[in-house]
């Protein structure tokens, strides 16, 4: 679907467009499915995809009915695959409420004979499941019934009472019942007995290790590695990685296949090939297996007394739909295994350490798909391993996406800077006449500038006459917008789109002025698509009616032949930024030719100045380092100690005077020399290592205590030219904790004396047995987390104790959960982990950051019986020292210098303007001229005062001093209105001043400049929120209250009423301090409200039908005279 939208973009608009696209695509999926069901064997795939792609508005009611029926069909299917059987239970009674037709035969019969009574229980509606399995199996199932997160227990190994056959019971909960899939354990399998996450890691350990060892920066390498590892792990004939594009169509981006199979790498297919409903199911059930697409499905029989239909969406056995089976058969794929790749939604905000904030929203990035030309069954443990591997893969995909965005943003910013530099020399023609040009800003095939009725063309663009038609069409049909973007000019309604289709079909355009426009163009998507599919033999011919990859590719090209690659939000943000730069450049050109080149050069070449301020910061840093309660030392580029604070002198017994001048390597233990040498060399190259452990020698009376163990962060010290001149080491003393861990290592068996010791030196320790159940939780963990020992013991450590949902200690996100699982599983296999960053939310919602070390636990025979986990917490002093280190970064200083420089440069021309106004005041002016000069003077005073606001925190916290003077409301109103008249005239908005004359002329006492600043801000925001041609009304009321004999307190209330839908909710939330200050409007509103608070006032915002109002209140004093 084409999207025509203003050239601004936001998270909310992105999400709403995404939702609208999904709804529309689901409607198309439903129609296509209905056509397939009606047509049967005569179904024509290619024509159906083309027809369903165009949704007629008149058919919408019918589409809704079709969609509802389709979704109900998807969710309420009543068939399963025959490789296993299914039971649905009433949780309260353990009785069967639904079963698959093959369940009695698989679970209760020794042979195909009719079941007998006694030892061979019959299975049907109302059967108690505990009578079907052996006592231990029945007990395990009984325990699962009361388990909150029942899926954490999967798979449960059970044995039939009748035959003794082993099955994996895979359980999930749906509304009203518990559904259990039973998959037979094959004779060649070693039955899985531990929790799925622990055992499955062993199967996928090699693949996970290889993924984690890959260098970042290449999505192609990551995907190629993933399909290679899955190919080796599962043994399928073909493994592919699918990626879903923004318009939901798919692409095969990586593939590995056995010789002789047709390659699908590079294949694109329409969005309808994988319907939205199927994608939703992949988000819920992340691994899906089809054993044999030709197998006959088995019906599920349900108790007729149940008041609802069971849904099998979460079942591992759920039967695929006939449409999908036919597609598989047509491409000679008999069996498949599909893994969902779920990543963070880029439209969402980042993670927060606040416990009350929701988790990041997820989206289906793509799929890892395995195909086989013969039936293939993959046991559940291996499928679980694949799911775990897919989660690790998704984490790395997420990182690659973030890295790609960072690189793109960096390139865009670099291009914007260069374009801005060109504008300083030649605005606006520099963006098309020099290099780089506007085509380098975003990916496009052509661009054009329409300026002062002349055209400049770059790359593939429409002709000049066609461009003039587009500009005329925009002026007629998009008058209210500052621009638009579309991936299809035809869908956007441009009459001449058909004549352009061979050249371009997507366009982004923004206005510099009402008549000047910048264009970017894209050709149709099909022009960029190449698929190196297998060549046809002479005489072969495709049957486009069949559902097949070749038909999909052909159908995709048909769908996108008049559509370009969509414009991404970050691309539109870059375009909009350039638009603002061009607008400002245009205004500057029309008003005055300032020497902007000199200013820009000065800004770009700006170095850190103001040595006094730098020296003050340095002195404060030195004082903090010397008095810090954590050990801190520093060395120069040669490794010679030039900093040695009181704490490290106390720990080592080496005074400051003796330490200074010694080489660092002579002060550390021999076993730590290589570690320190590597850390020092990396830091001198600018690579600052964190959480490195080494041991340092002791001296004097401290020698008998042995060496000091430190956890150290390196921080490179740099001069003004960014050259590394030394290294500072901020450390934490962990000698006591290391002593405990060493003692633990030496003790074999009797660990409880340490683990359960209440001594404060004992670090937080917890553990798990070999099956994944929490078996240790010491006093330090109770204090740290707020969870008692009895509340966590015998719960699943992964999922119940530490998890992302409904767990005791909530982890920040899915990535943290997966990484924690990897660390635990590595230790279970003998690979111990030391000091990895770890974090979780305590019972009270506080986020705890620490270092995690994991060691295996062994019995007398040397067998691994579980793992121990040790936490090391950073001391408050260390956290403070690191915080100070971050605050002293040179980036912050540079920004401060840039801001100081710009404010200084503004003051000089402002002083000239003030001087000119003063000169005018001394001349013989008429009354109206004097009024205009006075208004200008008030605006200049307001600007000067704002430039003095160097401490916004002071305003926000209420520490600003007000300048009190006599004034009239009339003066404030005139000055405030003058600041918004240009904007109101541009939009054709009438400003009605309904303030009564006696109120306007009342002499008041207060800070008039701050009042006019606030009033101008609220007027501007009201005008921006008012539709073109609307009206803004300002009114006032005034009440007096006598304080003593001579002073009157004035309560002034100003109302600004405007039409339209109102100020955006996000800006209002920022005004009241409910959200992080992000937008310019939000910051302005927030500061204005704080200024009102300083004047003992506040602001309210009222919404009514068709209009909204700001109500501003302030307290002032009244004088005794009226000004005429």
UniProtKB/Swiss-Prot annotation:
* UniProt modification remark: Contains one covalently linked phytochromobilin chromophore.
- Segments carrying the region annotation (Disordered) are 1-21
Domain named GAF: which ranges? 218-401
**Pfam families recorded:** GAF, HATPase_c, HisKA, PAS, PAS_2, PHY
Q: Where does phytochromobilin bind?
A: 323
PANTHER family hit by this protein: OS08G0260000 PROTEIN, PHYTOCHROME 1
Record protein name field: Phytochrome A
